Amino acid sequence: MPKVKENCCVVGIYSLTGKNVVPMVFDALRALQHRGQEAWGFAVPNKPPFKKIGLVSHSSSEFKKIAQEYASPCVIGHVRYSTMGTSTLANAQPLKVKDLCIAHNGTIANAQEISNLVGGCSFTPQNASDTLVAAERLVSLI
C-alpha cells in the first residue's frame, strides 16, 4: 500500500440564485492551496474540467477571464497533493468520466482490486489514480 501523505482539498459551491460561483471557488482553492501544491482545477456542468499544474496563486492574473468563460452556479474544485499517481496534468482533478466529474480527497487502499471490476480501466504506475478507478466504477454502476 502506498505511503499516506496529507490530503488534498475539495471544494463545492452551489448558488440557489444562479450567481456565478467560479470566483468563490478560486478564493477557496487559493486559501486552501497549502493542502495541495502540485496541481489544481475545477469543473462546471457541460464543460471539460479546467486544470493546471502548480499553485493556484500563480494563475491569479487569469482568474477574471477563466471565471467569465466557465461562469456557473455550480462548481467543484480541487487542489492536489498526490497519494497515488504521478504529478501530471492527466492526474490533476477534477476528473471526468463520461458525464461524471469527480474530485476526491484521500487514498483508496484497494484501488487495484476495484480496477479489476471495471474493464478497460488501465491502472499502471504512470497513470495510477485511485480517483479515476472510483469514477470508472461509479459510471459502471449508473
Please provide the spans of the model-predicted regions.
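Conserved short alpha-helical segments that host acidic/polar catalytic motifs at enzyme active sites
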Residues: M1-I142
